Amino acid sequence: MGDSQYSFSLTTFSPSGKLVQIEHALTAVGSGQTSLGIKAANGVVIATEKKLPSILVDETSVQKIQSLTPNIGVVYSGMGPDFRVLVRKSRKQAQQYYRLYKETIPVTQLVRETAAVMQEFTQSGGVRPFGVSLLIAGYDDNGPQLYQVDPSGSYFSWKASAMGKNVSNAKTFLEKRYTEDMELDDAIHTAILTLKEGYEGQISANNIEIGIIRSDREFKVLSPAEIKDFLEEVE
């Protein structure tokens, strides 16, 4: 008996021990645009492709990298609307923490809270899993941190990771290039080169997005002009 008859039931395990709706959510992530993150010695970079459905779309209106708090940013692969819901929930969680303790939420705790929301949507009736994986980058008292959260609600800390449709090539490239003592500028160059590896067409400052956080603990999304400078450095 195959898994297909279980594919519409979120809360029923198939005979092979899978929740098939989560498998489908991971397929949505795997068909999304490539995103990646690299933890450097003095910061973290997250980057993603920004392919638009039409040349008529105003590219400035599309933002795939968002800040959750002043010192934490996030990027996704998968379904954009699902990402926006999670961003809103994570920001609310961070605000509640700040209101209660009068300090910014630790990166690990915000990751844990976000993962708990995603996990809840894998065992409730009448809902479906989120069709996104997240890379969350932050800098707090524990230094630079990078986490990946998947639709199942599982999360891990990474030195460098990638997700989306070009994930295997991107991870292979990152494994070759990554070093423990990598500085942030070198990590930005590596991120651009990794995106270039599987990009169909010409990469430019307008079709990729890059977010960085340094030891000043201020998450920043780079402007097209800043991305252009880094692109010129790697060419």
From Swiss-Prot:
List localization entries: Cytoplasm; Nucleus
List the SUPFAM superfamilies hit by this protein, alphabetically: N-terminal nucleophile aminohydrolases (Ntn hydrolases)
Gene Ontology annotations for the cellular component aspect, listed alphabetically: cytoplasm; nucleus; proteasome core complex, alpha-subunit complex
Q: Which CDD domains match?
A: proteasome_alpha_type_2
**Which GO BP terms apply?**
ubiquitin-dependent protein catabolic process
Q: Which Gene3D superfamilies match?
A: Glutamine Phosphoribosylpyrophosphate, subunit 1, domain 1
Query: Pfam families under this entry?
Result: Proteasome, Proteasome_A_N
- Keyword line: Cytoplasm, Nucleus, Proteasome
Out of the domains of life, which is the source?
Answer: Eukaryota
Which protein family is it in?
Belongs to the peptidase T1A family.
What's the stated role of this polypeptide?
The proteasome is a multicatalytic proteinase complex which is characterized by its ability to cleave peptides with Arg, Phe, Tyr, Leu, and Glu adjacent to the leaving group at neutral or slightly basic pH. The proteasome has an ATP-dependent proteolytic activity.
Assembly: The 26S proteasome consists of a 20S proteasome core and two 19S regulatory subunits. The 20S proteasome core is composed of 28 subunits that are arranged in four stacked rings, resulting in a barrel-shaped structure. The two end rings are each formed by seven alpha subunits, and the two central rings are each formed by seven beta subunits. The catalytic chamber with the active sites is on the inside of the barrel.
For this entry, the protein name equals Proteasome subunit alpha type-2
Identify the species of origin.
Oryza sativa subsp. indica
- Could you tell me the gene encoding this protein? PAB1
